């Protein structure tokens, strides 16, 4: 988790001049502590279980394992296992794209997603990317859908960090996350 945090902090440092040109260098990275009561960074183990041939055959065409969504954090690092496919990103999201591009695992590679928090912080200079996990094709020899494992590190700013931008009112990262959680239950 420490190495993931360091990598995400480095990515934020590299993005900052473009994302938040008025910031002092290091402002974004410094707003993300890994440990302590103010920290909100999270490491999540994602498991999509295998499915029997009968269960897989009962699903409608175009089913997915995780529906289209964006991440709430600043940056997500996704570690995928080689040979376990399914992650897709919307192509050209500024234009309401319905086409999806696969993000196949690469040995030693890490998929990086910009999240909603960084999109807000940057006044939309960086867009959070819409992504999903599609249902892979069943194995031809068995008809079963294979398992998928991945690790996601969500680099979320500290609860007390102030997200300030020109287009929207300031909000603490803690209140931002609480607002996102609440929005799930108000629909």
For the regions a language model picked out, list residue spans one by one.
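C-terminal flanking tails of non-heme Fe-dependent oxygenases
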Residues: 5-187
């Amino acid at each position: 988790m420490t190495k993931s945090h360091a990598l995400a902090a480095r990515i934020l440092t590299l993005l900052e001049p473009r994302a938040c040109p008025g910031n002092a260098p290091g402002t974004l990275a410094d707003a993300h502590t890994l440990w302590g009561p103010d920290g909100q960074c999270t490491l999540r183990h994602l498991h999509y279980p295998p499915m029997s041939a009968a269960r897989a055959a009962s699903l409608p065409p175009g089913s997915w394992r995780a529906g289209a969504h964006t991440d709430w954090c600043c940056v997500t690092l996704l570690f995928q296992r080689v040979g376990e496919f399914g992650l897709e990103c919307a192509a050209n999201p500024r234009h309401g794209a319905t086409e999806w591009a696969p993000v196949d695992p690469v040995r030693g590679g890490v998929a990086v997603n910009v999240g909603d928090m960084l999109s807000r912080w940057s006044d939309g200079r960086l867009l959070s990317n819409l992504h999903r996990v599609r249902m892979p094709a069943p194995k031809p020899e068995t008809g079963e859908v294979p398992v998928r494992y991945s690790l996601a590190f969500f680099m979320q700013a500290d609860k007390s960090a102030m997200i300030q931008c020109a287009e929207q009112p300031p909000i603490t990262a803690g209140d931002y996350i609480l607002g996102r959680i609440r929005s799930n239950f108000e629909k």
